[in-house]
């Protein structure tokens, strides 16, 4: 393939761009909404963390999900992840999740256990019903001491459902 001078420059710029990935876990879809908005505004690739045993996404069964989440937390379980996610090809990884029992779901621990984030930039975001980030951003810093963890974005569940575009835009500008 033959490239002209300007095309060569464009290809070189693309090669030098930091590759970004948005990874998220979402049962009710609110973290997914925020993840999709981040991917849209950054041009990042996007991947869902899929549980090997799917969680019940029927909101009428919230209490059952809450009990299961508490049991997983109390027993320090690591739920299996169904899909493989290529984090090695990315420099910057946005990681999103809902808050369960004032922390992230145990499957997020599985995700951090499974992959090496050394030398990468991690940018967390989460959805919640009033607990903010619950200290999870500091937990990520402890779990991944060889990664650079930037300021995260906590989004209230109703704000995610009503459209997080402005909050995401403001947050992304603060990171740059």
Q: Where are each of the predicted segments found?
A:
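Glycine-rich phosphate/pyrophosphate-binding loop and the adjoining helix
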Residues: 148-176
């Amino acid at each position: 393939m033959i490239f002209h001078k300007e095309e060569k420059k464009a290809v070189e710029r693309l090669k030098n761009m930091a590759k970004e990935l948005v990874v998220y876990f979402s049962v009710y879809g609110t973290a997914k909404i925020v993840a999709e908005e981040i991917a849209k505004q950054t041009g990042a690739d996007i991947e869902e963390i899929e549980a090997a045993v799917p969680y019940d996404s029927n909101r009428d069964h919230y209490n059952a999900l809450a009990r299961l989440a508490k049991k997983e937390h109390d027993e320090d379980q690591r739920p299996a992840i169904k899909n493989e996610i290529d984090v090695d090809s990315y420099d910057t990884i946005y990681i999103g999740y809902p808050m369960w029992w004032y922390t992230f779901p145990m499957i997020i621990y599985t995700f951090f256990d499974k992959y090496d984030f050394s030398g990468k930039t991690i940018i967390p975001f989460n959805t919640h019903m009033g607990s903010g980030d619950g200290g999870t951003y500091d937990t990520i810093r402890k779990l991944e001491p060889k990664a650079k963890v930037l300021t995260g974005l906590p989004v209230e569940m109703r704000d995610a459902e009503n459209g997080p575009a402005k909050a995401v835009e403001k947050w992304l500008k603060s990171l740059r």
